[in-house]
Amino acid sequence: MLSPRKVKYRKKQRGRLSGEAQKGNEISFGEYGLVSLETYFITARQIEAARVAMTRRVKRGGKVWIRIFPDVPYTKKPAETRMGKGKGGVDHWNAPVKLGTVMFEMAGVPRELAEAAMMLASSKLPVKTTFVVRRDLR
């Protein structure tokens, strides 16, 4: 699973996401993309599940790019622990995804296969998504 090798601060305050994506909102590498229609934190496990679903659907054909990275720590205290005694340990890593963010890209496969693979990956994610085609291919 994806996680940062080294971070400046091990734990972070939760914070909130708002607004639309100002960067990472255009297809840069591939021919097709999966774009978020909602703002949400996506876990490293969800990203990996979507990646596996996509690559299995295209059966070694084409190339897949993951455009989001889980670099925000999510802490959690152990079960049945009293309050206090400091902040809990890092439970997992999240990727902040805003509305309009291109999460995955794909190239080297027919459009129908790419769309089917992306929709399969979309079912593994907690956000509504849409399939997009690069502008110069339309």
UniProtKB/Swiss-Prot annotation:
Pfam families tied to this protein: Ribosomal_L16
Which ranges are annotated Basic residues under compositional bias?
Answer: 1-15
For whether the record's keyword set contains Ribonucleoprotein, the answer is yes
Q: GO CC annotations?
A: cytosolic large ribosomal subunit
Gene Ontology annotations of biological process type: translation
Ordered alphabetically, the record's keywords are: Ribonucleoprotein, Ribosomal protein, RNA-binding, rRNA-binding, tRNA-binding
Similarity section = Belongs to the universal ribosomal protein uL16 family.
Q: State the PANTHER family in the record.
A: 50S/60S RIBOSOMAL PROTEIN L16 (PTHR12220), LARGE RIBOSOMAL SUBUNIT PROTEIN UL16M (PTHR12220:SF13)
Its biological purpose is as follows: Binds 23S rRNA and is also seen to make contacts with the A and possibly P site tRNAs.
HAMAP family according to UniProt: Ribosomal_uL16
Q: What is the official name of this protein in its record?
A: Large ribosomal subunit protein uL16
What is the originating organism of this protein?
Borrelia turicatae (strain 91E135)
